From Swiss-Prot:
The keyword Secreted applies. Expressed by the venom gland. It is found in: Secreted. This is Anionic peptide clone 8. GO terms for cellular component: extracellular region. Belongs to the non-disulfide-bridged peptide (NDBP) superfamily. Long chain multifunctional peptide (group 2) family.
Length: 74
């Protein structure tokens, strides 16, 4: 009996936390595949305004272009 109550409580807590996560971070569930396209159009002012996460994405994009594996995706 206790284990059923514990499982139900765990399931409800997961559902509630998932609901609040989607309400707090709705953009995290949107597909943003054009982020790399946005990095193609950077100028000096844009580079100065980049967040650390953008710099990581820019570095990953540059490494992907430099790698030999990139040719396999074309």
């Amino acid at each position: 009996m206790v284990s059923k109550s514990l499982i139900v409580l765990l399931l409800v807590s997961v559902l509630v936390s998932t609901f609040f996560t989607t309400e707090a971070y709705p953009a995290s569930y949107d597909d943003d595949f054009d982020a790399l396209d946005d990095l193609d159009d950077l100028d000096l002012d844009d580079l100065l305004d980049l967040e650390p996460a953008d710099l990581v994405l820019l570095d990953m994009w540059a490494n992907m272009l430099d790698s030999q594996d990139f040719e396999d995706f074309e």
